[in-house]
Amino acid sequence: MNLENYFISQFQNRYIGNDGAFIDGFVYSKDAFFENVHFKKEWISYYQIAQKAMLVNLSDAIAMNAKPLYALLSVAMPKSMSKQDMRELARGFKEIATKYHVEIIGGDTISNSKLDITITIISKTKKPLLRTGVRDGFLVAYSGKLGNSAKDLKKLFNLGFLHDNSKFVNIKLRKKLVYNTQRYLKAGMDISDGLFSDLEKIALANSVGFKFSKPISQYIACSGEEYEMLLFFDKRDKKTMLRRAKLSRTPLTIFAQVTRNRYRNRCKAHHF
């Protein structure tokens, strides 16, 4: 168990352990997006910073098969930010909120030495997609293509810039895939810390392991901030899942099967 999972385990209750807390039909989720931890200001614009901060938070709601409704923003801003910078930051928040029909209903602002953002999303669902309920024999799949986020991060450190279509800033949320397949899904979560690190969370929550159908490269296994979906479903629903993924225009890769073996994550933790 890595240090992040260890710390979270100190607060165990029936609400903690998923992408958000499901309470009386609502999902409450919160994520941080901090300068010099998740991004460097010289890498991307204020507009892009706000967009990504909103998208990574909406990802948690969508990953739980919930419809995002409201957002609360907390923004710690350096005094060096100009009014134009603030307008660009606000424009990024508002554009993504409008696209996903989310209303920004409040929050907090403070002065700080760097730009730090935390967002709370309030969503609604009748059938939450949880991380528990995984059993021996289930198939394991991920959406989209993994590994590009890590490659783009390496480019940022080496070159200091990215192409406009980089996955580091252009996150694709798999709303259609989740909503169109939720009937067949047994469990799921978004891939934010990397495929193997997020598999570790599932393994710990369900006391299971995984048998991989083929070797997985380091880039695919350990690339964080992908925000693709990690999904679990019954073997008998394999054809249906692949068909519905195709209808959603989402690549779906089945790469493992759930076993009773112990699972060991071989990737370094991103947060601790």
Residues covered by each model-derived region:
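Acidic, Ser/Thr/Pro-rich beta/coil linker or hinge segments at domain junctions
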Residues: 169-172, 245-272
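Active-site-proximal betaalpha loop/short-helix elements
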Residues: 80, 168-226
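Glycine-rich anion-binding loops of enzyme active sites
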Residues: 33, 69-154, 257
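Short, compositionally biased
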Residues: 151-168
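Residue-level signal for inorganic ion chemistry
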Residues: 57, 65, 104, 137, ...
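Short hydrophobic/aromatic beta-strand micro-patches
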Residues: 122, 230-234
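Small-aliphatic-rich amphipathic alpha-helix that forms the alpha element of a beta-alpha
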Residues: 46-71, 91-99, 174-176, 194-202, ...
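N-terminal glycine-rich phosphate/pyrophosphate-binding loops that anchor nucleotide-derived ligands
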Residues: 1-62, 102, 138, 214, ...
